[in-house]
Amino acid sequence: MSIKIAFIGAGSLTFTRRLMADILSVPELRNAKIAFTDINKHNLEMVTTLCQRDIDANGLKIKIQSTLNRLEAIKDAKYVINLTRIGGLEAFKLDIEIPLKYGIDQCVGDTICAGGIMYGQRGIPVILDFCNDIKKYAESDCLLMNYSNPNAMLTWAAEKYGGVKTIGLCHGVQGGHWQIAQVIELLVNRDRGIKKGDKNYIYVNQKDVHIICAGINHQTWYIRIIYDGKNWTERMLEGFELHPIFRKTEKVRIDILRRFGYYSTESNGHLSEYVAWYRKRPREIKKW
């Protein structure tokens, strides 16, 4: 019997399509029942069309159930994935503009500080509603996978107060993993005196680099980095400072790496708003 996976907030093109690709890459899930729901009919229809096209192009038999009725989508679901942005971009704009009026310059404002708190106040009541629906209509052992921000707040609320088994997920680890592979490639060839274009140049891909990460959403760290049987964690600072692109684009991440010894999964700007000293004054923000 095939399992059912429901997406709430499926009108989020980037996240929904990326997650569908991940799901369909797992052989055991290629016969899953997929249900999409969203309150925005236009976005829901657009994303459904694109994802169905991806499915058909790969010769799979899945037909996406697309509905504006959340209860229909989650009925009998084994997994429910939350991708919602409560309040939409209009509310997100206020999360940035209101704090800025009082001198709080956030980069994204979706996790902590004033913006994160306002975002959480909108999201927590809604995710608790989702939990109530899941308990009533989904399978009894349904797992809620939360991709929405503020991730830690929403996941905590669903797990502790919603009474539904919940995990929080984010794509940040993969992005930094690619950067780390590039840095190791630079170091490996530099150690051997090999230049790009030489016939014995060594290319390093993500699949070649094994990582262990620890932390919470938007505060996660690569605490162990293994390539070719060796631990490269302590050489990350050297590599990032040498990299011709990353040393310019990842100044905050490199500074944090220098201070604390671990590279962060978060983007440069995102990381800058989680500590106290990068965004205190406009001229300092420009520096980083």
Could you describe each region identified by the protein language model?
Residues 184, 188-288:
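Long, compositionally biased stretches enriched for glycine and/or charged residues
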Residues 6-8, 56, 100, 258, ...:
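Generic detector of intrinsically disordered, low-complexity, polar/charged segments
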